[in-house]
């Protein structure tokens, strides 16, 4: 009998930073990976060379989201997990209509996960008890809000709430959890003053790197019991 191939993990927004690191993490485990990307960063070529199936996607419209879902279904009839990492960042500022800001934030952080979870549900089901996972990457601002990024915080809070709703809908076959990170890694252009200021906002005073997220996801994938929960990865920042 031929050995059964593992089901792919789908990661949205894997062109850089945490999404990119997660894709390489699972590829190193010989786990098939499907990624979405919006911008063709050079790192996408590296993912292809490492064995990932890389699909360009436009989540700025519902049609674009559903077209991507159909593309995924054309390549596989089962998924091990969906990691909703695709994200956008837009502040309320003069000259930009508020409706533009809220619609853009809700489109990427709410419409995309909502539609994809429904469209790809059948690919996650049918593999046994707690055999599949959905991970929503939210943000620590879900807990405290943001006066400068109100729409962003609201959209991530909606995604956090959907975690519990989908956990109820998809149990016991599929576990659904959220991860709410604060500072995980710096950008190359961040100067020393900014870095120190950012580090001082948490109790642990480090930028832990992407491994902190991949280790947590490994645990959640292994668990057969944990679902409907949000895990803060913030170094104790709310306690400062």
UniProtKB/Swiss-Prot annotation:
Main enzyme class: oxidoreductase
Catalytic activity: (6S)-5,6,7,8-tetrahydrofolate + NADP(+) = 7,8-dihydrofolate + NADPH + H(+); 7,8-dihydromonapterin + NADPH + H(+) = 5,6,7,8-tetrahydromonapterin + NADP(+)
Active site: 152 (proton acceptor)
Region forming the signal peptide: none
Described function: Catalyzes the reduction of dihydromonapterin to tetrahydromonapterin. Also has lower activity with dihydrofolate.
Family from the record: Belongs to the short-chain dehydrogenases/reductases (SDR) family. FolM subfamily.
Protein name (database record): Dihydromonapterin reductase
